Amino acid sequence: ASIPNNLTDFYNQAFYTLYQRHDASKSGYKRELKAKLTPEEFRNILAYIGLKTFFEGKVDFDRTTLDDIITKYCLKNNFELKTNDIVYDATHSACMMLQEGVSLKFSHRSFQEYFAAVGINQLDDKLQRQILVKWSEADRNNISSHRTFMNALFTIQKERTFKNLCIPIIESMDEKYRRMGDITERISTCFKCFICSKDSRENKLELGFLLKNEVYFYYS
């Protein structure tokens, strides 16, 4: 098999390989799939689960939560699915999820972030922008702390990510800056401190600064 060019291709290839793989037996016996879904159909369900759990900040979730998610997915897409079948296929056949007692989670946090990116790509621009902006504003560290999600998002839908996340962030900063009064207010609002140091080699002064956290977010 060819080596993927980026992590997004790796996760995509890993999913299709695991979902369609055969047991390591000479007879080539294929793993049982209880939900009887095509790879694309099952990928879409995982994307919806990833979308819902990621943006709700849930790494672990119980069967009731998953049942609610699958019920909503079925209503939206005119599907009839059993949660038990999805859990079995996700944990035993595709190995995309782990079950520990009554708790479920993606087999790796990066898989959850990848499927969340796939899921949000399936939304229209208005809803996608609403979710992404709310997520970025809820915690200023969200963007820098979820590199897999951001990398997948830019790989899957670069232009839409600029449109629905980057530009709104810039517009928000511009609006806040315009609402500020004189230069004194702008300095006190944006800068934590200024740092003056001397470059002994060139015998000159250098001026640096630290941005306040709420402003640094827009440049991180």
Enumerate the language-model features and the residues they cover.
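Extended hydrophobic
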Residues: A1-L104, R109-F111, G119-L127, I131-R147
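Hydrophobic repeat-domain scaffold segments
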Residues: G50, A117-S220
